[in-house]
Design a protein with these regions (language model features):
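Ligand-binding loop in jelly-roll beta-barrel domains
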Residues: 57, 84-105, 159, 186-209
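Bacterial N-terminal signal peptides
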Residues: 6-15
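Positively charged n-region of N-terminal signal peptides that target proteins for export
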Residues: 1-4
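Short acidic-glycine-tyrosine-enriched beta hairpin
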Residues: 66-84, 170-186
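Glycine- and acidic-residue-biased ligand/ion/polar-headgroup-sensing regions
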Residues: 47-65, 149-168
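A short glycine-rich, His/Asp/Glu-containing loop-to-beta-strand
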Residues: 21-55, 117-144, 151-154, 204
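Surface-exposed beta-loop interaction hotspot
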Residues: 88-137
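Short beta-strand His + acidic residue motifs that chelate non-heme Fe in jelly-roll/DSBH
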Residues: 42-44, 61-62, 82, 86-93, ...
Length: 213
């Protein structure tokens, strides 16, 4: 009996360790970063719609809701959307898969944001009733015109030192490191990359919430 109980506790501890701790958890999103070993499957999520950001080049398999398994070749910085019933990611290409899964807690929205507020060089990756996802690249020593973000998750693929000038003239310095996964409140600003490295960020803006931090 004691041996069985010890084995049971070991199993529980292994299961707990296999589920990554959230990098971000608030009333809008749960964001988890995970490394999936070759031939393994990502940990169970919360059964929520999500945007998944890939952090390395890999081959993965997934099963869409009610469909057959499909194989995808993904690149670092690629993002896919999955509904609540879409299957988990499997590292099917012989290499590990590093990813950030951003679960969306809102009920969704019929609003279409499009490119509203975005800087001209931002690349809109996709938008639906749950999220707007876009790619940000700011070369070292360059500036962006004034633009506006909603509340968002930022997944940093190349870190940099940024300086933001707000509409009231105040200045905020922001240091992003490669690998950061952070929550940022909505803001309007002019951005300047004052560092020596290019900034590359994926922004995931959840929908279905009233404006505010």
């Amino acid at each position: 009996m004691n041996r069985f109980f010890a084995s049971y506790l070991l199993l529980l501890s292994w299961a707990a360790a296999s589920v990554p701790a959230p990098a971000i958890q608030n009333d809008r999103v749960i964001a988890c970063e995970e490394t999936v070993s070759p031939a393994a499957v990502e940990s169970p999520g919360e059964g929520l719609p999500n945007a998944t950001v890939f952090l390395n080049d890999a081959v993965v398999s997934r099963t869409p809701d009610g469909g057959r398994p499909v194989t995808l070749t993904v690149r670092r910085g690629d993002v896919i959307f999955r509904g609540p019933k879409d299957g988990r990611i499997e590292a099917s290409g012989g290499t590990e898969v590093r990813l950030v899964r951003v679960d969306i807690l809102g009920a969704g929205s019929k609003a279409t944001w499009g490119r509203a507020g975005l800087a001209p060089d931002y690349r809109l990756l996709f938008e639906n009733g749950y999220v707007r996802v876009y790619n940000i690249f700011v070369a070292a020593g360059t500036s962006e015109p004034q633009h506006t973000h909603h509340n968002r998750v930022v997944v940093c693929l190349s870190g940099a030192q940024m300086r933001h000038i707000l509409p009231d003239g105040s200045v905020q310095d922001s240091s992003l490191r490669t690998g950061d996964c952070l929550w940022r409140p909505g803001q309007t600003h002019i951005g300047t990359n004052v560092g020596r490295t290019d900034l590359w960020v994926i922004a995931v803006e959840p929908k279905g919430f009233s404006p505010g931090p």
